[in-house]
Structure formats: structure tokens, C-alpha cells
């Protein structure tokens, strides 16, 4: 959430910066609400001062033996007006808060300006796509050949956009997740966490999924209890660990990593990536989250992105790194890098990780703070998150990039210890 003080003092500047994201801020409505708020607040404060004076007069009139009934009636009338003013102020503030919750973050000055993914800027590439000397098969054909990737049974169980993995491919999927977690914990300094897969609405509001993106979530309504939502990413549960907390500066940076299933309705993805595992309602992901001091968040974004890239490098998967433009960034981000891995059957790079610095945007929504050692006062932390990596899409990339002419799959060297030394599957 943006700082309401910034919005009041630099409304047009904020609107101009948001316009670069394709977001039209309703400046007129905000100005009208602010004017209403000031008017009601001024009137209420004047009325309160008058009521206090009348209340004081009652005591004085009583001492003089005068009739206090008219004064009492005035005070009672003012109390009613004050109560009505309070209700009016609360209604105005509720609408302002609702508007604030729907405003995306302001892009960092280093973010390229653009309308959509065509405005993204390639930062670097790593690896060279393999030139196969045989017809390339996609991951669906490779997996179904041996009955290890079963979309038909998954559809019988759950409907479209689900997958059933069996045998060596299920083991390879597990190996990938274990490899990623171990790398981030032992070499990148993250603390592993096992988190709930169901969260309440305030957690999703804290990270920015609610209220704007509720249609993308799976919701479990409960009578007499708070509704629960299946997490769309472990970013939600990991980041909210510090919600409502004041962290000692000596604890920073805090670095969490978790391997969880993720659940998304893919409400806006009708007709896109309907074949295979690229876009699923349920998929596994290894998620990294960092909680840092404000002055260190841009540096942390570079290291977070490097941590995700290391996974791809050790797996020997060609990829490219993109700086997302203003029009393609996620709701909560001030700056984002996307990693795209090479998918041979599609002859192009596909997103496999998104690494974002959210500044104090999520922290303000969550009231996550640290105590500044210089001032002794609480200040908002900065939060970052990134996929390290999406396990299903990494499996797709391994199957396709390590395929052989007979349809078998070579096991990447770094995964062999997790596969019992197995070198080839199929």
C-alpha cells in the first residue's frame, strides 16, 4: 500500500508514475474525498470545542443556581452531531482505504517504461540452446510415452489443468525440489520453513493478492469462522511471518525459503497453455523471501535473482534474464526481474522465475517494521520475493533439454544424488 501522506502531498506526481504502469488513478475522487474529510474534521473539531465549553458552563450555571436544562439540551444535541460526524469520517476513511488497497506500487526509477511484455528489456543470457539432431518432442509426449505423465487420469480426478506424475518422473520432480531447497539453505543462507497452505484474508491483503485479485484464488468458505484461501505462492505465508512485528535490526536480513504446492484459478488464462504442465491449477514451487532494511533492498534484489539463476546454471538449463517494464510488473513490485528458461519444443524462452523488490508496499499493509538503531524508532522494512524455482516448469525444461533420440531422459549431474545415482530414465 502506498503512503497516504505521499498521496495527499504529491497526488498528481503519483498519478503520473502510476500511469506508466497503465493504472489510471482517480485523482478527482481522491481530491473530493480529501476535501470532504477536511470539512467534516474541521466541523467536528469546532463542535467538540463548543461542546466542551458548554459542558463547563453547565457546572458554572449550576453553582449560580440557574436553569441548566437549555445547556444540557445543547450538549446532548452536540453529542448527537459529533456522533454523526464520527460516522461520516469513518465512511470517508473507509472509501479512501479501499482506494488505497487497489493502487499498485510505484515503479523504481530504474524500471524501463513500457506498456506490456514487449517493453521488457533483456539483461543477460546464460547457456546455449542444444541443437538436436533428431525431431524434438515436447514434455507431454516424453512423459506419456512411458505412462509417467498422465493428464487423462488427473482430469478424471480433478478436471482440467492438473497432472498426475508417476514413477521416475515423480521422483525427478521431488529431486528438483530437494536440490533447490538444499542449495538455498546450504549455499545461499536461507532458513527453511514449512508453512500452512491455507491462510486467512488478512495475510493475502498484506502481500497484495486481496482485495484486487480474489478471482485468482481458491477460497474455502466456513460458517462461523474466518474464510480460508489456498496459497497462490509461499510468498504469502513466508512474508506474513513478520506481519505486525517490530524486528530487531540485528536480525536483518531475514531470509526464508519454502517448498510448497501453489493453487491458482488461472481465471484470466482461458485458452492459454492448455497442453501440458506449463499452466496448472496446482503446482509446486520453491519460494525465497527476504526481509531487509530499506537502504539494502535494491542490492538484495540482485542477490535474490542471482540465487534463482544459480539453480538454472547448476542444472545446465539455458535461460535469459529480463528487467520487466512498468506495464508488465506485478501489483506489489517496485522492480522485477523475470528468468525465462529455454523450452526446445516451443523454440522459445518461457518464464520460470519472477524476482521482485516490493519496497515498503507490503510492509505498510502488514505493519511489518524494524527498530532503527540510530533513531530508536520503528520503520517499515522492505520485502522481496522470488521463485527459486517453479518446480513443474523446471521439470518441463529438464525433460525437454535432456531428451535423447529414443525418448529417454538424461539425469542432470546435480540431480543424480537425489535419484539414487540413476543416470537415465526411460
From Swiss-Prot:
Entries under InterPro entries matching the protein: aa-tRNA-synt_IIb, aa-tRNA-synth_II, aa-tRNA-synth_II/BPL/LPL, Ser-tRNA-ligase_type_1, Ser-tRNA-synth_1_N, SerRS_1_N_sf, SerRS_core, tRNA-bd_arm
SUPFAM superfamilies in the record: Class II aaRS and biotin synthetases, tRNA-binding arm
Enzyme Commission numbers on file: 6.1.1.11
Keywords, in A-Z order: Aminoacyl-tRNA synthetase, ATP-binding, Cytoplasm, Ligase, Nucleotide-binding, Protein biosynthesis
Top EC class, one word: ligase
One BP annotation, GO: selenocysteine biosynthetic process
Record pathway: Aminoacyl-tRNA biosynthesis; selenocysteinyl-tRNA(Sec) biosynthesis; L-seryl-tRNA(Sec) from L-serine and tRNA(Sec): step 1/1
Transmembrane regions listed in the UniProt entry: none
A Pfam family assignment: Seryl_tRNA_N
Cellular localisation: Cytoplasm
Catalysis performed (reactions): tRNA(Ser) + L-serine + ATP = L-seryl-tRNA(Ser) + AMP + diphosphate + H(+); tRNA(Sec) + L-serine + ATP = L-seryl-tRNA(Sec) + AMP + diphosphate + H(+)
Gene3D superfamilies, per database record: Bira Bifunctional Protein, Domain 2, Serine-tRNA synthetase, tRNA binding domain
One Gene Ontology cellular component annotation held by this UniProt entry: cytoplasm
UniProt GO MF annotations: ATP binding; serine-tRNA ligase activity
Record note on domains: Consists of two distinct domains, a catalytic core and a N-terminal extension that is involved in tRNA binding.
PANTHER family linked: SERINE--TRNA LIGASE, SERYL-TRNA SYNTHETASE
Family indicated by similarity: Belongs to the class-II aminoacyl-tRNA synthetase family. Type-1 seryl-tRNA synthetase subfamily.
Task of the protein: Catalyzes the attachment of serine to tRNA(Ser). Is also able to aminoacylate tRNA(Sec) with serine, to form the misacylated tRNA L-seryl-tRNA(Sec), which will be further converted into selenocysteinyl-tRNA(Sec).
Subunit structure: Homodimer. The tRNA molecule binds across the dimer.
Full protein name: Serine--tRNA ligase
Amino acid at each position: 500500500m502506498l503512503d497516504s501522506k505521499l498521496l495527499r502531498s504529491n497526488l498528481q506526481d503519483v498519478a503520473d508514475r502510476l500511469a506508466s504502469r497503465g493504472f489510471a488513478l482517480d485523482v478527482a475522487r481522491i481530491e473530493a474525498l480529501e476535501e470532504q474529510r477536511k470539512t467534516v474534521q474541521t466541523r467536528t473539531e469546532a463542535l467538540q470545542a463548543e461542546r466542551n465549553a458548554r459542558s463547563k458552563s453547565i457546572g458554572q450555571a449550576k453553582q449560580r443556581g440557574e436553569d441548566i436544562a437549555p445547556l444540557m439540551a445543547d450538549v446532548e444535541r452536540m453529542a448527537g452531531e459529533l456522533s454523526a460526524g464520527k460516522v461520516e469520517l469513518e465512511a470517508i476513511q473507509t472509501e479512501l482505504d479501499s482506494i488505497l488497497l487497489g493502487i499498485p506500487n510505484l515503479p523504481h526509477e530504474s524500471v524501463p517504461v513500457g506498456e506490456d511484455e514487449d517493453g521488457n528489456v533483456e539483461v543477460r543470457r546464460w547457456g546455449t540452446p542444444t541443437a538436436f539432431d533428431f525431431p524434438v518432442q515436447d514434455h507431454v509426449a516424453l512423459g506419456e510415452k512411458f505412462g509417467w505423465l498422465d493428464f487423462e487420469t488427473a482430469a478424471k480426478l480433478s478436471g482440467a489443468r492438473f497432472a498426475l506424475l508417476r514413477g521416475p518422473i515423480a521422483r525427478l520432480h521431488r529431486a528438483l525440489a530437494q536440490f533447490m531447497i538444499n542449495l538455498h539453505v546450504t549455499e545461499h543462507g536461507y532458513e527453511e520453513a514449512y508453512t500452512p497452505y491455507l491462510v486467512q484474508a488478512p495475510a493475502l491483503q498484506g502481500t497484495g493478492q486481496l482485495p484486487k485479485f480474489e478471482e485468482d484464488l481458491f477460497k474455502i468458505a466456513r460458517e462461523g469462522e474466518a474464510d480460508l484461501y489456498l496459497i497462490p505462492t509461499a510468498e504469502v505465508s513466508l512474508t506474513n511471518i513478520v506481519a505486525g512485528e517490530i524486528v530487531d535490526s540485528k536480525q536483518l536480513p531475514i531470509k526464508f525459503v519454502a517448498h510448497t504446492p501453489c493453487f491458482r484459478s488461472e481465471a484470466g488464462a482461458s485458452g492459454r497453455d492448455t497442453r501440458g504442465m506449463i499452466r496448472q491449477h496446482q503446482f509446486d514451487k520453491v519460494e525465497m523471501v527476504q526481509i531487509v532494511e530499506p537502504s539494502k533492498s535494491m542490492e538484495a534484489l540482485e542477490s535474490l535473482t542471482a540465487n534463482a539463476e544459480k539453480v538454472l546454471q547448476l542444472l545446465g538449463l539455458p535461460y535469459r534474464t529480463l528487467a520487466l517494464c512498468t506495464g508488465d510488473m506485478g501489483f506489489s513490485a517496485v522492480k522485477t526481474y523475470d528468468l525465462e528458461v529455454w523450452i526446445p519444443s516451443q523454440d522459445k524462452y518461457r518464464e520460470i522465475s519472477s524476482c521482485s523488490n516490493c519496497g515498503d508496499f507490503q510492509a505498510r499493509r502488514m505493519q511489518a517494521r524494524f527498530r532503527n538503531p540510530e533513531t530508536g524508532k520503528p520503520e517499515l522494512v522492505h520485502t522481496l520475493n522470488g521463485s527459486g524455482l517453479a518446480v513443474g516448469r523446471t521439470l518441463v525444461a529438464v525433460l525437454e533439454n535432456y531428451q535423447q533420440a529414443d525418448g529417454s531422459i538424461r539425469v542432470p549431474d546435480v540431480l543424480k544424488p537425489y535419484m539414487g545415482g540413476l543416470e537415465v530414465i526411460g
